């Protein structure tokens, strides 16, 4: 059923308003940036006033995944599996230098060079570790992106979520993923 163009814009506005002011957050904290995430959720910064509900019970109840800290190759399948368990529309914030690009460990044999190599990222928050205000700024940027989205088909609001169905794994297929073998350091 197609919605008439006259009704499309108000419906899109109401849906996006509800999505952007009721984000349930699933924090995937891997290092010191996770401490800053906890500080942001406390009363001094209180991101619940922005409509962000911290500490969802799990990925199946979350709209937003915040990946904070160093992403190792062994942790990569777990991140992918948890992302796949989130319902559409789903959003990701990469929080801190380590999750953005590997941080100070970028040259390590066991570090993934950014979480965006595993899952699509909506907002990058730089810093080592970023201040709580930086995460609040990133959340505001994400809310602006959500407000500008088109009304999705079948619950999917981001076009890139369905762009590559070959990358979508069946529910338990991510369990069979293994970490790449340990590479010895380059002698040169």
From Swiss-Prot:
Q: Which UniProt keywords apply?
A: 4Fe-4S, Cell membrane, Iron, Iron-sulfur, Membrane, Metal-binding, NAD, Quinone, Translocase, Transport
- Keyword Cell division among UniProt keywords: no
One GO MF term on file is: iron ion binding
> What HAMAP family does this protein map onto?
NDH1_NuoB (MF_01356)
Q: What is its EC number?
A: 7.1.1.-
Give the UniProt entry's GO cellular component terms.
plasma membrane; respiratory chain complex I
Catalytic activity from the UniProt record: a quinone + NADH + 5 H(+)(in) = a quinol + NAD(+) + 4 H(+)(out)
Cofactor mode of binding and number, as noted? Binds 1 [4Fe-4S] cluster.
Region described as Disordered: spans on this chain? 153-188
Composition skew (Low complexity), residue ranges:
157-177
Task: Cite the record's note on assembly.
Answer: NDH-1 is composed of 14 different subunits. Subunits NuoB, C, D, E, F, and G constitute the peripheral sector of the complex.
Membrane topology listed for this record: Peripheral membrane protein
Q: What does this protein do?
A: NDH-1 shuttles electrons from NADH, via FMN and iron-sulfur (Fe-S) centers, to quinones in the respiratory chain. The immediate electron acceptor for the enzyme in this species is believed to be a menaquinone. Couples the redox reaction to proton translocation (for every two electrons transferred, four hydrogen ions are translocated across the cytoplasmic membrane), and thus conserves the redox energy in a proton gradient.
The family assignment reads: Belongs to the complex I 20 kDa subunit family.
Keyword NAD attributed: yes
The protein, known as: NADH-quinone oxidoreductase subunit B 1
Which positions bind [4Fe-4S] cluster? Answer: 32-33, 98, 128
The UniProt gene name for this protein comes to nuoB1
**Which principal EC class is assigned to this enzyme?**
translocase
From which domain of life does this come?
A: Bacteria
Which GO BP terms sit in this record? aerobic respiration; electron transport coupled proton transport
């Amino acid at each position: 059923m197609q919605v008439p163009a006259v009704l499309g814009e108000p419906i899109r506005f109401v849906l996006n308003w509800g999505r952007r002011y009721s984000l349930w957050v699933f924090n995937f904290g891997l290092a010191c940036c996770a401490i800053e995430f906890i500080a942001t959720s406390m009363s001094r910064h209180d991101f619940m006033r922005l409509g962000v509900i911290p500490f969802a019970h799990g990925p199946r109840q979350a709209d937003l995944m915040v990946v904070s800290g160093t992403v190792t190759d062994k942790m990569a399948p777990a991140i992918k599996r948890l992302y796949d368990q989130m319902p559409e529309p789903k959003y990701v914030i990469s929080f801190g230098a380590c999750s953005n690009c590997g941080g100070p460990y970028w040259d390590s044999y066991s570090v993934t060079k950014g979480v965006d190599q595993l899952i699509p990222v909506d907002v990058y928050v730089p810093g080592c570790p970023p201040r709580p205000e930086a995460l609040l700024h990133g959340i505001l940027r994400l809310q602006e992106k959500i407000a500008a989205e088109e009304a999705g088909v079948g619950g999917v609001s981001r076009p890139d979520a369905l762009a590559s169905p070959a990358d979508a794994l069946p529910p338990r297929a991510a369990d069979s993923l293994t970490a790449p073998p340990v590479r010895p350091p380059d002698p040169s």
